[in-house]
């Protein structure tokens, strides 16, 4: 509504494309998150909080790993994919789509945290604060539009509130005694930063390498996924976690 008020209906086409990408990527990861949520619920109900701390870190890695397998190629080849999909790509669609993928990153990372809060049953205060944080997106975007008159700030505001919500979720789960924040930072976040430091130059290189065919894009995508798996094995996951993840995925596909 705010985008429409400031920039007209034409900007809504780019926003609609970004929303479709958001839905597709998040639903892909969420289909796996639904499979592991009972483990978190059961572990909390049994008051095995030390195990729960490990599960939160493990399932966070699992979720982010799946997200990156989809999001990194999509982020890298957004322009080419949109051109094939739409032919006539709306203004800002490329930028909106990439910024949306960043929003999804923090939401995927947050999922094991809010699932744990739900398992506790103490969600009233949590829901009020989270709702307040997320709704801040609207006034922040409005003020940015008034100052700079650039539609991109709608997504900058989304990213900002997604980060705030993630920080609050970490704090909330820590208060429940279900998360060692120091171990969460060192065991997950710092490893994730290391992974991104390696992956970002690959994305940057492909930004300046023009893709001329679908087959070339597919070949590059498989190369990126292969490199991502290798890098994740050494930087994000330990050997036991790597084995557990692929056993977990194989069980899910057998059920499907």
Predicted stretch roles:
Residues 124, 131-167, 174-175, 179, ...:
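Membrane-interface helix-loop junctions in multi-pass transport and translocation proteins
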Residues 29, 53-108, 135-146, 201:
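Alpha-helical transmembrane segments of multi-pass membrane transport and lipid-handling proteins
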Residues 12, 125-127, 153-155, 184-187:
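Alpha-helical transmembrane segments and their helix-entry boundary regions
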Residues 101-132, 148, 177:
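Membrane-interface junctions at transmembrane-helix termini in multi-pass inner-membrane proteins
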Residues 55, 60-75, 88, 130-134, ...:
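Short alpha-helical transmembrane segments in multi-pass integral membrane proteins
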